[in-house]
Amino acid sequence: ALLSRDSDNKVQPGLAKSWDISKDGKTYTFHLNNNMCFSNGDKLDADDVAWSINQLKEKQYYNANQVESLDKAEAVDANTVKLTLSTPDSNLLWYLTGRPGLVFDKNAKYNAKTEAVGSGPYTVESFDSASKMVLKANAKYWGTAHKPATQNVVIRFLTDDNAAVNALKSGDVDVLSPVNATLAKSLDASTYTVSAADGSDKFVLAFNCTNAKLKDKRVRQAIRYA
């Protein structure tokens, strides 16, 4: 992403190595790292950044509401991007560590459902929603701080908690996340390291508006007020 977060959830450089904010809080200027490229070899520059952010708002993709105050994103030069806002937004830097800050290759032609073109240390070699995703070290990765530590990473999707813990105990997997508190207690502290942290999951209670009674707005309001 254009920006990143550290383990304390504080905003850090990402594709942008630094940035400036105008006194009125309505102009953000981002200075990009040099010599960046996508996994397909295409150069990653300010045009890609500006295009990606503008597309997010124009097409109203996921989290487009987070850049609601954006008037436009533009490439000043190959390594400089300027974001102009209609009103100041103190959350903008934080938002640019997430979906609004994702940068896509504006010139790439590929099927986004089956392929991925990114700029990180790994590329997606294969994906099966029922079993696993295989990541491969990106030979064209431009960064120095997060060089791939291993050539391949296999992420398996284990739907049964007990089976997942047994896979860890048998050595079938090296890392397990998440693991519920009850099963975590069964792991030998001398053999395994169990880490706990705040989660970012969101739980939503939504109305099924195909239900005859819930179609009535007054019923939904009454439930909400209860």
List the predicted regions and their residue ranges.
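Surface-exposed binding/hinge segments that line
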Residues: 20, 24, 65-105, 126-128
